[in-house]
């Protein structure tokens, strides 16, 4: 374990692939036992941790596949979408690293001498078990003798039961011949035989075309995991036409030429099949059936290419290794061609009618191989990426989740879950608005009233909200979309409320915050959250709760009563009013009254109670009567307007300054702001305006 470069360790309750950075040895209590600690870095992350060597495993491809299968079998996502994407990206990087190491390992590249580590074990053992007991020439090496014997024995085993009738010597010799263009595979199996055309030029050309086509096709099959049975069947039928024309006796010597490629000149001096048992016409006819029976009894009869006109399917692992098995096959091509020509010249009557079939077979085989190669290349280009699990809608509500909530008579509106109380089955949510306070308390509602933001009814809820609040709901959706995009691309990591309070969301927020008057939001979040919904189904009972009256107006009237008592009963503002009339104190209200030519029909009196206002006005009228000669010339002509525009504001400002113990400027600013209205009062006022507008439209 200490030698592994990549390991699988546990971090944050999950198995993560990691890269080993360093190894440290620490002394344990028992001196004989030594503990090793590994400094590892989580793949695709910058997180570095230290783990015990006994708590990790060497990273293997099977581990990644098991984890992926486990994730695919889960119904619920165990973590947030961002954490899940991070974890799967780390697994993807680990899988790429393992594939890269596999492709760069020496086992995947063929050795030039024709022997690979896989060839030196199992294939040699198979060939050794299948070598005939007949003597072989002395100039052949042990490996070459095994290959030659395999050539004979395998060709005899590949015959079907229908072709086991007594054969002539030329037909038996035909089972030993091998085209040097095809050669032997690494596992010792013979390649497909290529028939020789009659013409001098067509023989070499067609053979080379088929050779390149087979090599490219087998390379594609080695890379891809599957085959097309239909295409393979067509190619086999095309090859069977070419295989049926190989009936010359001189071609039997190619088996020895392939078995000993180092000494081709010595091979042709004596009997061409002297060292191979399968090439003896006398012995082979009697040994075919016993060999077949013995192999069937052992269960080792394998499907190989047949030379009697048919062909069994070629296994997937036989293909590109043909080149490495016979390094000097090109040197034998000239001699084999000469022998074939000599054999064909002995029987000219058979060669002429077969030439047309051979040329047709070569063309069909070549075209089929090219089509198969093109289709497999298209499959590689259209290879789908690794499967990614779709995001399933969570069944429970968590903190920070985006939801829909129906509030009073307003449509469903997006909100954020601030807290969840599982025992009470309630959640505190905060509606998404233009002036939303991320630190606000929100309202408490039942979990049954919440809907996930990405629920099936999402589009219907959006359409319903757009009927009355098109611009507002569009802004909310754009804000949520921008948050998810930044979360996915990694430019922001945090909850939605943190995103709303951060500067990164300002470009989206300012479009609404700078246009408060033009965008109308529903009045949400400060009423009774458990009020029954307006669109509840008929017959469905909902608890009816009594709405308490608004106490903010009563509180303001009680505070204003102190001002009235200060003005009327205590007469505390009378000296201030006389100083203004005698021009001892400046007054913006008197200056505006004298310079204004317009008659104001509406004014802010600050006092909301009519009785309080009448009491103050009567007192000010008495003051005017007492100071009739001291009033300004213009004020004497319009006494009511002078009282409302000058004396009433000055008296109230003086009372605010005295009662609340503030200076005159602060009291004047409070008077200009007017009474502070509550949220419910604004809502009632807006509802009255909407009802009035709807009534006029009707």
UniProtKB/Swiss-Prot annotation:
Interacts with TP53BP1 (via BRCT domain); the interaction is not dependent on its phosphorylation status. Binds nucleosomes. Interacts with trimethylated 'Lys-36' of histone H3 (H3K36me3) (in vitro). The modification Phosphoserine is found at residues 105, 165, 168, 170, 355-356. Residues 102-145, 159-386 are annotated as: Disordered. Keywords: DNA damage, DNA repair, Nucleus, Phosphoprotein. InterPro entries: MUM1-like_PWWP, PWP3A_3B_4, PWP3A_3B_4_C, PWP3A_3B_4_N. Residues 370-384 have a biased composition (Acidic residues). The PWWP domain mediates the interaction with nucleosomes. Residues 212-235, 341-350 have a biased composition (Basic and acidic residues). It comes from Rattus norvegicus. Belongs to the PWWP3A family. The keyword Nucleus applies. Residues 399-460 form the PWWP domain. Residues 129-139, 200-211 have a biased composition (Polar residues). GO terms for biological process: chromatin organization; DNA repair. This is PWWP domain-containing DNA repair factor 3A. Involved in the DNA damage response pathway by contributing to the maintenance of chromatin architecture. Recruited to the vicinity of DNA breaks by TP53BP1 and plays an accessory role to facilitate damage-induced chromatin changes and promoting chromatin relaxation. Required for efficient DNA repair and cell survival following DNA damage. The keyword Transmembrane helix does not apply. It is found in: Nucleus. GO terms for cellular component: cytosol; nucleoplasm; nucleus. It comes from the Eukaryota. One of its GO terms (molecular function) is nucleosome binding.
């Amino acid at each position: 374990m200490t030698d592994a470069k990549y390991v699988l360790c546990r971090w944050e309750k999950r198995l993560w692939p990691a890269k080993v950075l360093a190894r440290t040895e620490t002394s344990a209590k028992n001196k004989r036992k030594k503990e090793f600690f590994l400094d590892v870095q989580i793949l695709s992350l910058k997180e570095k941790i230290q783990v015990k060597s006994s708590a990790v495993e060497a990273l293997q491809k099977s581990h990644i596949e098991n984890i992926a299968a486990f994730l695919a079998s889960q119904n619920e996502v165990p973590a947030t979408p961002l954490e899940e994407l991070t974890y799967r990206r780390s697994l993807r990087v680990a899988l790429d690293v393992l594939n890269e190491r596999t492709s760069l390992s020496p086992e995947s590249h063929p050795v030039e001498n024709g022997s690979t580590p896989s060839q030196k074990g199992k294939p040699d053992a198979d060939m050794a078990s299948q070598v005939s007991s007949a003597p072989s020439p002395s100039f052949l090496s042990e490996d070459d003798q095994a290959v030659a014997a395999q050539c004979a024995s395998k060709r005899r085993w590949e015959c079907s039961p229908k072709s086991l009738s007594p054969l002539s010597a030329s037909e038996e010799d035909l089972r030993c011949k091998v085209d040097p263009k095809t050669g032997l595979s690494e596992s010792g199996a013979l390649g497909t035989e290529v028939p020789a055309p009659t013409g001098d030029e067509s023989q070499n050309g067609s053979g080379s075309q088929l050779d390149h086509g087979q090599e490219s096709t087998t390379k594609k099959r080695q890379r891809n995991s599957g085959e097309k049975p239909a295409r393979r069947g067509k190619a086999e039928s095309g090859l069977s036409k070419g295989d049926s024309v190989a009936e010359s006796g001189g071609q039997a010597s190619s088996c020895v030429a392939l078995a000993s490629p180092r000494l081709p000149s010595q091979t042709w001096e004596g009997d061409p099949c002297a060292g191979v048992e399968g090439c003896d016409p006398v012995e082979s006819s009697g040994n075919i059936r016993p060999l077949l029976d013995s192999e069937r009894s052992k269960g080792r009869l394998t499907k190989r290419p047949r030379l009697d006109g048919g062909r069994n399917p070629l296994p997937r692992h036989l293909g590109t290794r043909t080149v490495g098995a016979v390094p000097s096959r090109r040197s034998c091509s000239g001699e084999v061609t000469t022998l074939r020509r000599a054999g064909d010249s002995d029987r000219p009557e058979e060669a002429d009618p077969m030439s047309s079939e051979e040329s047709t077979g070569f063309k069909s085989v070549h075209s089929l191989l090219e089509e198969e190669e093109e289709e497999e290349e298209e499959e590689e280009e259209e290879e789908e990426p690794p499967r990614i699990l779709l995001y399933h809608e969570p069944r429970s509500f968590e903190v920070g989740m985006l939801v829909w909530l129906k509030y009073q008579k307003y449509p469903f509106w997006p909100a954020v879950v601030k807290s969840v109380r599982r025992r009470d089955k309630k959640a505190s949510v905060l509606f998404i608005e233009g002036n939303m306070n991320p630190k606000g308390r929100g309202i408490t509602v039942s979990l049954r009233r919440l809907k996930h933001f990405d629920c099936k009814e999402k589009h219907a809820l959006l359409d319903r909200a757009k009927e009355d609040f098109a611009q507002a709901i569009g802004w909310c959706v754009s804000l949520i979309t921008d948050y998810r995009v930044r979360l996915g691309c990694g430019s922001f990591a945090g909850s939605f409320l943190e995103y709303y309070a951060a500067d990164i969301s300002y470009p989206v927020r300012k479009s609404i915050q700078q246009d408060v008057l033009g965008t109308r939001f529903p009045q949400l979040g400060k009423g009774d959250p458990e009020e029954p919904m307006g669109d509840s189904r008929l017959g469905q009972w909902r608890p009816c709760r009594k709405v308490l009256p608004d106490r903010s107006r009563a509180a303001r009237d009680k505070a204003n009563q102190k001002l009235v008592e200060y003005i009327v009963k205590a007469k505390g503002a009378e000296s201030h009013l006389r100083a203004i009339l005698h021009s001892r104190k400046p007054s913006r209200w008197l200056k505006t009254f004298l310079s204004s030519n317009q008659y104001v029909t509406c004014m802010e009196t600050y006092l909301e109670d009519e009785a309080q206002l009448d009491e103050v006005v009567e007192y000010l009228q008495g003051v005017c009567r007492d100071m009739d000669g001291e009033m300004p010339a213009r004020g004497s002509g319009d006494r009511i307007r002078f009282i409302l525009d000058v004396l009433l504001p000055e008296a109230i400002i003086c009372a605010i300054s005295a009662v609340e113990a503030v200076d005159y400027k602060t009291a004047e600013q409070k008077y200009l702001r007017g009474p502070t209205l509550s949220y419910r009062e604004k809502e009632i006022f807006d509802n009255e305006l909407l009802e009035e507008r709807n009534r006029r439209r009707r």
